Amino acid sequence: TPEVVMVYSDKGLNGMSQAYHRLYRDRLMRGKWRNHARPILLNNWEATYFDFDEEKILNIAKKAKEVGVELFVLDDGWFGTRNDDYQGLGDWFVNKNKLPNGISGLSRKIEEMGLKFGLWVELEMVNKNSDCYRAHPDWLIGAPDRFESHSRHQHVLDFSRSEVVDFIYDSISKVIEESSISYIKWDMNRYMSEPFSRGASAADQGKTMHKYILGVYELYTRLTERFPDILFESCASGGARFDPGMLYFAPQTWTSDDTDAAEREKIQYGTSFVYPIVSMGSHVSAVPNHQLHRTTPLSTRANVAYFGTFGYELDLNLLSAKEIEEVKAQVEFMKEHRDLIQVEGDFYRILSPFEGNDTAWMVVSRDKKQAVAGYYERLNKVNASWMRLRFKGLDEDQLYKVKWEDKCLKAYGNELMYAGIPVDRDYCNKTNGDFHSVLYTIEAED
């Protein structure tokens, strides 16, 4: 019988979400990273895709260090013959043509810069153009003598078989042991089809999918026990496997491969109904966005990404001097407020992106002394009506100082929650444009 997770709330959907957040954050997540703020990272995927070598990676990492980033993550393309997505999966040994000093040499150079090093893997998958497949063609999920569906040019390894799990465990453990790795992003970029195991009898084929996920859990268990300090992030073409079972092993999940800030408002708003902020992978990416070709302000991209694990997925060397200074300020802001946002605060949804043009949410400390709120306007409008942003979760009798942009006001909690504060509108369409956002910091006054 499948397990069910249920909570009770007498404070509406925000109360329900906070109960889930505390349950998962305090009781489901394990180890070193339970109730621990996340490092600010830079991932090279949208900066380079498969086209990189050691020099290019080190140049990106050097710039990341300059702006205050703490963790550099090397994504897909570092192993086997992985120069595109047609080949290489299953061969978990370094591509020496790209990285002549190996992952061990690269990770040491990254650490010498003062950064931690992270690595992307997709351990459950295999390409037919790989040494792994050529040696073990029967390790694929799929019936013999029938067509084996591929997706992204890849196939699923049969993790219902212990020898497959053992092989992958030995392969990736060797890479980790030889290197200095602080973070692993574990991806899964296709669904399972034709669920037939060539290692099981006809009578046991109905157990294949269940035994497969038990094999995934087994590999996670062995890796997390052997390498307890590594921060694991799960991923499945984004958030396709965002569930409590995975959070037990990996305390954060890449929420979506869609990194567009406007889309992320809906994605992160919806995810927040059940999953805590600290579990939601969120990055500032380049513009035009690589998924939608939409351009959003750098400030808005950060203002959305703050409410997650926070990081960057772009080549900082391509930014202007002004943008670099803005990124430095963003990193400083997140370092100052990440304990509140990710670990110590309660999350409140205020305005739904599914119900109008505006989105708003906030995080309030348990003692109600501090809060950070985000407001996002999707499309600019001519002669838009006046509106007030009404905060939630504050102490009605407490005097607060609210800061945003170059403005500041003082008001009691009941005023801020029931009357709210006016939202600045750009009535002449001269400055804000589409996808404008405002970040508010709220602090109790003595």
Language-model features, listed with the residues they occupy:
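Short Pro-Gly-centered flexible turn/kink motifs
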Residues: 1-10, 435-442
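Flexible loop/turn segments at secondary-structure boundaries
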Residues: 9-12, 48-51, 79-85, 124-129, ...
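Aromatic-lined carbohydrate-binding/catalytic grooves of carbohydrate-active enzymes
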Residues: 33-167, 183, 193
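Conserved, mostly hydrophobic/aromatic
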Residues: 42, 72, 110, 168, ...
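Active-site neighborhood of glycoside hydrolase catalytic domains
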Residues: 100-102, 134-136, 140-297, 309, ...
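Catalytic cores of secreted or luminal carbohydrate-active enzymes
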Residues: 299-351
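Carbohydrate-binding surface patches
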Residues: 353-396
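C-terminal beta-sandwich/jelly-roll accessory domains of carbohydrate-active enzymes
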Residues: 379-446
